[in-house]
């Protein structure tokens, strides 16, 4: 088999597969061909659109879970070569807008979509997970969640800056986005970023159970200590937070 043939097979391979279980939960498996870890690429847009069309048209699907086909990686982020290939700011903006649109469609699904996370869930991977209606993560040391774009001189471009503060509060969200700090699964659960932490052996079943239970109730605000409430829910407090964030950004 020639190198060209292998390249062509990788290019034509599907990244997302949908398997409908007997209990009515559809399991979406993401497995990027030719990559040791899953990364997000603009080239997946048409495949994701077709997948969403298939899901919407199948009335037998009661819920969804999305899991990685890689052994020790959920989604490590956006494809760096794709970002490096941007010649203009508009090209980068277009990629971010595409991500926002796709994740917005995931969030708008009328059936529960649960992310089953094992391994690195970073950058665009976390943005995708936050667009899901629930998140289950393994207690494995390989599982970390974060938005490390700042380490590349970037900010999250596909909804992370809007969704993260709603889940963990503005103060922690700014800290994560401006430092690239990554959270272990237990830390992420304590912060409100994931709903459950389970052993890897029952990850998929835990996600399926959550999907069958319906969309989690997100009406309750993030629980914050008194000082945190002053900082986040008063104009003076938010001014202090943004002032600190500005100073931190200028130090980069």
Feature annotation, model-predicted:
Residues 134, 175, 179-181, 196:
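Well-ordered beta-strand positions
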Residues 105, 128, 163-164, 175-176, ...:
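Hydrophobic/aromatic ligand-binding patch that stacks against planar heteroaromatic rings
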Residues 100, 105-152, 156:
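Glycine-rich beta-to-alpha active-site loop
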Residues 161-171:
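Hydrophobic, secondary-structure "cap" segments at the distal end of domains
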Residues 2-13, 42-46, 52, 172-174, ...:
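Intrinsically disordered, low-complexity segments enriched in small/flexible residues
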């Amino acid at each position: 088999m020639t190198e060209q043939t292998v390249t062509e097979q990788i290019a034509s391979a599907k990244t997302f597969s949908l398997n409908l279980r007997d209990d009515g939960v559809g399991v979406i498996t993401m497995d990027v061909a030719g990559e040791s870890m899953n990364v997000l690429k603009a080239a997946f847009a048409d495949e994701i659109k077709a997948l969403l069309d298939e899901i919407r048209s199948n009335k037998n699907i009661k819920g969804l879970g999305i899991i990685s086909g890689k052994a020790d990686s959920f989604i490590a982020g956006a494809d760096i070569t794709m970002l490096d290939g941007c010649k203009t700011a508009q090209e980068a903006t277009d990629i971010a807008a595409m991500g926002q649109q796709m994740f917005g469609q995931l969030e708008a699904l009328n059936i529960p979509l649960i992310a089953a996370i094992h391994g690195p869930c970073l950058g665009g991977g976390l943005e995708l997970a936050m667009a899901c209606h629930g998140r289950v993560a393994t207690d494995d040391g390989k599982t970390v969640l974060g938005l490390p774009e700042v380490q590349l001189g970037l900010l999250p471009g596909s909804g992370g800056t809007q969704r993260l503060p709603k889940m963990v509060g503005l103060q922690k969200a700014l800290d994560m986005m401006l430092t690239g700090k990554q959270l272990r699964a237990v830390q992420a659960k304590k912060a409100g970023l994931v709903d459950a932490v389970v052993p890897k052996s029952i990850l998929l079943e835990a996600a399926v159970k959550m999907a069958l239970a319906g969309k989690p109730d997100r009406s309750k605000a993030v629980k914050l200590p008194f000082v945190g409430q002053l900082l986040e829910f008063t104009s003076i407090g938010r001014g202090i937070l943004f002032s600190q964030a500005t100073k931190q950004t200028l130090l980069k």
